[in-house]
């Protein structure tokens, strides 16, 4: 009998010790009132983006104006203390300036050349854009082949009647040397340094505005910038649109490029803006600005 009582007392003591141990463990796991959560709790809490400040200077393509304006506005809601400046001086100037270190990021509406890459320029493609062939709204010509377009810009076709239009001498409008739009247009058609321009302009807006005011004019412009003051003709039977640029069926298209320099560390603010511009977050923003996100290209 005494052995049974002793055994029962021993079992009771073991149970009591186990209960005390569990209680201590629970107390050690629960934070005291007013104290921060343990690392296990913190792991379940999302960390917001680091708040940055400073200025990011960008320079280059005028065709990227709408995309850059949208990027800057949207990025400002994430990093309100970062100021992003955009200067539309042309693709060539933007590439030159980023390589010289006078701006943080360059902007180009054409692919980088092998020479520019050899100098350290890095090509970050954010979108694709069609180069629309634009005419006056009263012009009855609605479709041109790439061969006809090349012949018009080289001065081999000089009257609209030669391509099914009204009788009238064609006024050929284009961009200035160094323009990314001009570089892409001439390269795609194989007419580099062979164009017979009536007038050259320093911005996409100037080309569109002058074509809109001249019934005999033809020009080229970023599809994302085309408005109802001009008509964008079909090329080889394909109407320029975001869809035909994305699927590759529209023949005259080029990339929108954010240019950085190999081995050159960006400021935290500039790096954050670059990361944002290259992220999937901006796909809808690019589309709303009239371009095609690079991720959607065929």
Each language-model region and where it sits:
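Positively charged n-region of N-terminal signal peptides that target proteins for export
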Residues: 1-9
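Exported/periplasmic ABC-transporter solute-binding proteins
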Residues: 4, 21-25, 30-32, 36-100, ...
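C-terminal motif of bacterial Sec signal peptides marking the signal peptidase cleavage site
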Residues: 15-19
